[in-house]
Amino acid sequence: MQSSLAVNEKVEILAEALPYIRRFHNKTIVIKYGGNAMTEEILKQSFAKDVVLLKLVGMNPVIVHGGGPQIDSMLKRVGKEGVFIQGMRVTDAETMDIVEMILGGLINKEIVNLINRHGGQAVGLTGKDGMFIRAKRMLIKDKEDAEKWINIGQVGEIEYIDPSLIKLLDARDFIPVIAPIGVGEEGESYNINADLVAGRLAETLKAEKLILMTNTPGVLDKNGNLLTGLTASRVDELFADGTISGGMLPKIKSALDAVKNGVKSCHIIDGRVQHALLLEILTDEGVGTLIKSEG
């Protein structure tokens, strides 16, 4: 027999979730899925259950996934090493083939299958399907020479996202699972950072929330302390003083652009915590770092 205390605690948890379920009913929540949550079995299972539950209580989760560690593993198997500049993967033609194989094939279908096994109806896509993510080659500015631009290969900069396909799937109660691969004017493939795709998609869909899952508790200051709440202006300061760097750069850029362009809030959460999505969306305290526009 469970103790009455344990039962009461469960009831309180359910009661705490009720106002959030009501508030976010029929709202779109874009989730960037990555990090340890994609590789550890217990975290994969809890993620899938969370997504299905969000859908069942009336929210519209849209998943954008990464796959960096899996891509790196395959590159090593073929004798190549991953190279990053300012948090972006340098992508030559051979690397692009591997990216498409891993992201659009192996990982995407694994996530779809996982969600479906837990009672959801997930559909896997890349941005090439219906050409719904149009992209062009990205050039990045050299930190040492402001007038110099660096070509990092088939890395895409988003030009346009057509939301009609995603809205159609949402309306039919499917859960879109999107690999961040875009398509150019000539049909060429582009590897796009998953954080940037998630942010731009959240803007396009006018999402209530953007959630980025990471391998850290959230945004940390220079002493390693968690910053639980940030405004857009404070984020700009952290960019300027170098607190935000490396792989966190595209995440924060995605979050900042999203909240400046109509997304109500962005949450950077620790994907290593079981049921992190539910803790963030359905509890009073939440987890991780909340980023909002001014005010």
UniProtKB/Swiss-Prot annotation:
The keyword Kinase is annotated on this UniProt entry: yes
Q: Does the keyword ATP-binding apply?
A: yes
Give this protein's Gene Ontology molecular function annotations.
acetylglutamate kinase activity; ATP binding
Keywords for this entry? Amino-acid biosynthesis, Arginine biosynthesis, ATP-binding, Cytoplasm, Kinase, Nucleotide-binding, Transferase
Known InterPro entries for this protein? AceGlu_kinase-like_sf (IPR036393), AcgluKinase_fam (IPR004662), ArgB (IPR037528), Asp/Glu/Uridylate_kinase (IPR001048), Glu/AcGlu_kinase (IPR001057), NAGK-C (IPR041727)
Q: What pathway is it annotated to?
A: Amino-acid biosynthesis; L-arginine biosynthesis; N(2)-acetyl-L-ornithine from L-glutamate: step 2/4
Superkingdom field: Bacteria
UniProt GO cellular component terms: cytoplasm
Q: Which GO terms describe its biological process?
A: arginine biosynthetic process via ornithine; L-arginine biosynthetic process
Where in the cell does this protein reside?
Cytoplasm
Site note Transition state stabilizer, residues: K32, K251
The catalytic activity of this protein is classed by the Enzyme Commission as 2.7.2.8
Residues where substrate binds: G67, G68, R89, N191
- The main location is cytoplasm
- Per UniProt, the enzyme's principal EC class comes to transferase
Per the record, the similarity remark reads: Belongs to the acetylglutamate kinase family. ArgB subfamily.
- NCBIfam families assigned: argB (TIGR00761)
The free-text function statement in the UniProt record for this protein reads: Catalyzes the ATP-dependent phosphorylation of N-acetyl-L-glutamate.
Q: What is this protein called?
A: Acetylglutamate kinase
* Species whose genome carries this gene: Nitrosomonas eutropha (strain DSM 101675 / C91 / Nm57)
Point out the gene that encodes the protein: argB
